[in-house]
Amino acid sequence: EKAGRTAARLVGMAEAGNIGRVIIAAGSLDARDHSDRIKGFRAVLKRDFPNIEITPVIETMDQPRQMRELLSERLRNDDGNTAIYNVGAGNEGLVDAIRMNGRDGLSVCVVHELSTCTRDALEDGTIDVAIDQRPEIELNRALALLQAIVDDLPPPPAPELIPAIYLRDNLPNEPL
């Protein structure tokens, strides 16, 4: 939920008190991480940014092609969209849809995970924010847990993982 709450705060700040309308894209509402992010996103908007409307969620099955088609349709046919929040994968399709349809009226676009695609899109202004859950740390934690299980040891401590928020201005120097 924290990642969704963070995304909502960023969208709310970008809207700066104006009337807004956000498109949410999710791989699947049945995926717990996606539904948790949406729950956190909705909670913050409802509490702190009631001026921002949420349109019906687009389900893309995390497929770039489906994302491109569904988001393009929404951007072409729904007036007044001011923000996009993608809770899942399929960012290649999201980037394609925005590039094909333009950013007219969009104040902010927030996605998850820093990849080559999202890095390029941040650099050229197609998207604005990538919230990175730092998958390399999650993977290392999972491996350490598996090793502890194999060695019949208690699980290692796992401090809370704070996501990194990337903008075009603070991208890491090393390539992805």
Task: For every predicted segment, state its role.
Residues 116-126:
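Glycine-rich, charge-decorated loop segments at or immediately adjacent to ligand/cofactor-binding or catalytic sites
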Residues 26, 111-113, 167:
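Short beta-strand/turn micro-motifs composed of small residues
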Residues 45, 134-176:
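Hinge/cleft segment of the Venus flytrap/periplasmic-binding protein
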Residues 23-32:
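Short beta-strand->loop
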Residues 41, 56-117:
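Hydrophobic alpha-helical
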Residues 21-24, 45-65:
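Short beta-strand elements in bilobed, periplasmic/extracellular small-molecule ligand-binding domains
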Residues 3-7, 32-52, 66, 70, ...:
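Short, solvent-exposed amphipathic alpha-helices that sit
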